[in-house]
Amino acid sequence: MKSDPVSFDSSHDLMARPRHDWTRVEAETLYTTPFPDLLFQAQTIHRRHFDPNHVETASLLSIKTGGCPEDCGYCAQSAHYDAGVKATKLMDKDAVLETARRAKDAGAGRFCMAAAWRHPKDRDLDRVCDMISAVKALGMETCATLGMLTPEQARRLQEAGLDFYNHNVDTSPEFYDKIITTRTMQDRIETLACAREAGLKLCCGGIIGMGEQVGDRLGMLILLANLDEHPESVPINLWNEVRGVPVNDTADRPDPIALVRMIAVARIMMPKSVVRLSAGRQYMTDELQALCFVAGANSIFIGDVLLTTKNPATLRDAALLDRLGMSSPLDGVKMPAASPS
């Protein structure tokens, strides 16, 4: 049964202001709206708050890989699974800074530093704060994902120059325990609160395609949209195949239309948030990515690798955005010479 499109009349104007009281029925009604109407609504809201022809870019570096004590069932960096990832020590600041310089030269406006920890130790946080200050001095936006934080740790990160803290909720509260047992959803919410109270912007989203139902995907969006403040960035990750992890047994990557619907609903429910196409873009055709941009996605990660998984080449991204007539920090990236016809 198809739902009637959600109207934009004066009694239910989705564009009036961000809401924090979304219901399951409203989310399901949006999701099942006829596809052309859903994209029209999402694009209308997108145009109210963003340049619809611009895409932000960010780069992600694993500054400490593997050996994580958490048992996230999708993650190659968990010490619980044999995913072929070798644990490393925390990188030196100079190496991180050089990578950030290259990312900036390649067109990244934001540099994200990720460490596979349950929570950072204070001695490690000292070094991370030095990295953040150095990257900030390059003129880039800074982001970090380091696990759970105390209020004091969040404050220190903010004082070091951190702009965004990434801490995903991963999935719906109902599906969460099927994926992770060593960290609760409440743990995640408390870390988000610590980051927000310290004055950090939030980057918070999740993963789709782990075996969850559509209702779980919508439940994740409802959770995010009903926070006191919407995350400034909402990354939508498409499940990446990772050997040796339990999610392989349940994974069911959504069909392209389902992904576009998810992006559109995220845009409508969180109208001022940047919606990022994150991990999994290597599985998307150019046409699918274009539809996601129409639905309201307006950010991508660039670089050949995201932590331990593959990502489209930056030149491919630049070429796609050029074909679509969309602007981005990649505009200055040199295109490969065209093949002779």
Curated annotation (Swiss-Prot):
Catalysis performed (reactions): (4R,5S)-dethiobiotin + (sulfur carrier)-SH + 2 reduced [2Fe-2S]-[ferredoxin] + 2 S-adenosyl-L-methionine = (sulfur carrier)-H + biotin + 2 5'-deoxyadenosine + 2 L-methionine + 2 oxidized [2Fe-2S]-[ferredoxin]
Gene that encodes the chain: bioB
The protein's Enzyme Commission number: 2.8.1.6
GO biological process: biotin biosynthetic process
Function summary: Catalyzes the conversion of dethiobiotin (DTB) to biotin by the insertion of a sulfur atom into dethiobiotin via a radical-based mechanism.
Residue ranges annotated for the Radical SAM core domain, each copy included: 53-272
Family membership noted in the UniProt record: Belongs to the radical SAM superfamily. Biotin synthase family.
Cofactor(s) needed: [4Fe-4S] cluster; [2Fe-2S] cluster
Cofactor info, note text: Binds 1 [4Fe-4S] cluster. The cluster is coordinated with 3 cysteines and an exchangeable S-adenosyl-L-methionine.
Residues reported in the UniProt entry to bind [4Fe-4S] cluster: C68, C72, C75
Record text on subunit structure and interactions: Homodimer.
Protein name: Biotin synthase
Domain of life the protein comes from: Bacteria
Keywords, in A-Z order: 2Fe-2S, 4Fe-4S, Biotin biosynthesis, Iron, Iron-sulfur, Metal-binding, S-adenosyl-L-methionine, Transferase
Species: Nitrobacter winogradskyi (strain ATCC 25391 / DSM 10237 / CIP 104748 / NCIMB 11846 / Nb-255)
CDD domains (alphabetical): Radical_SAM (cd01335)
Gene3D superfamilies assigned: Aldolase class I
One Gene Ontology term of the molecular function aspect: 4 iron, 4 sulfur cluster binding
Binding site for [2Fe-2S] cluster: C112, C143, C203, R276
Pathway in which this enzyme or protein is active: Cofactor biosynthesis; biotin biosynthesis; biotin from 7,8-diaminononanoate: step 2/2
